[in-house]
Amino acid sequence: MDAFIATFTSPGPELFQLGPFALRWYGLLIAIAVLIGLNLSSSLARKRGLEQGLISDLLPILVLTAVVGARIYYVAFEWRNYSGDNFWSSINIFGLAIPIPSAMEIWGGGIAIHGALLSGTLAVLIFCRWRRQAFWDVLDVLVPSIALGQAIGRWGNFFNNEAFGVPIKGDLAWKLFIPFVNRPLNYANNEFFHPTFLYESIWNLLVFTLLIVLFQRSNKGLLKLPAGALSCIYLITYSLGRVWIEALRTDPLCLGALPPSCEGGLRIAQLMSLAMMAVGGFGLWWLYGRKRKLPDPGRPKSFA
């Protein structure tokens, strides 16, 4: 009997095509995640007593900034694939080929969540200073939606046949089939790989569940959760999972080396995750060890 009980095979990146326009699964999943996140974070914001309509005002800015930041971050570390002869590409609109920089072809894949987190956090900070809102309170109602959005968005990697793990060795109860054209050259003869998209999706669902449980207990007065604590917990828990999952991937962003092994170099996502864990750990120590509030960059006077 076949030892495998679950085989994942992508139907392809496109849901359907209408003329020159195609609806991609990745885009649809991101849209779904944004809508769910809007409703969830708006509900949490009401429970936190934040200004009505704050999240709906912030969301368009946050999404745009996060997507642009995710793309810039990815292109910066993969510049060899977007420079020189690869700099220009084209987009076909009603039979007319329009030249564009290849770095703008975000629909072809190539975004990095750490870039989205960095640029998104900056957007929240600027927004809070503009609206004179408490930065940590706003961030705390966003992080559960971010974790859930990551869980949903990871399935976009499945449809795109990207961000998969190393070939499966031995018997496992699951496997991911990758078409020949999407396999790294050194794994061209391997058909089945670790479904790292699934690992991270499940991990992010667990992080989301933890954050919601903590938020609800805090809201009921059963747990002391100072402003910023939930954000710090997200940084630690998400990064814990990302560190070990990243070690399995065949397409990591590398520093001083090339994928899939990054031999002789470093995996950027692991470095960023370790840094996020350190920041989150320091934040919790500040809140619970020193029993002090986190300085609020959204309200400059709080530094006085």
Swiss-Prot record:
Pfam families in UniProt: LGT
Record's subcellular location: Cell inner membrane
Membrane topology note: Multi-pass membrane protein
Domain of life the protein comes from: Bacteria
UniProt GO molecular function: phosphatidylglycerol-prolipoprotein diacylglyceryl transferase activity
EC number per UniProt: 2.5.1.145
Record-listed a 1,2-diacyl-sn-glycero-3-phospho-(1'-sn-glycerol) binding positions: 154
Record pathway: Protein modification; lipoprotein biosynthesis (diacylglyceryl transfer)
Record's keyword terms, sorted: Cell inner membrane, Cell membrane, Membrane, Transferase, Transmembrane, Transmembrane helix
GO biological process: lipoprotein biosynthetic process
Regions crossing the membrane: 18-38, 58-78, 106-126, 133-153, 195-215, 221-241, 268-288
Enzymatic class: transferase
One term under GO cellular component: plasma membrane
PANTHER family the UniProt entry points to: PHOSPHATIDYLGLYCEROL--PROLIPOPROTEIN DIACYLGLYCERYL TRANSFERASE, PROLIPOPROTEIN DIACYLGLYCERYL TRANSFERASE
HAMAP family linked to this entry: Lgt
Family of the protein in this entry: Belongs to the Lgt family.
UniProt function note: Catalyzes the transfer of the diacylglyceryl group from phosphatidylglycerol to the sulfhydryl group of the N-terminal cysteine of a prolipoprotein, the first step in the formation of mature lipoproteins.
Name of the protein in question: Phosphatidylglycerol--prolipoprotein diacylglyceryl transferase
Organism: Prochlorococcus marinus (strain MIT 9303)
Gene: lgt
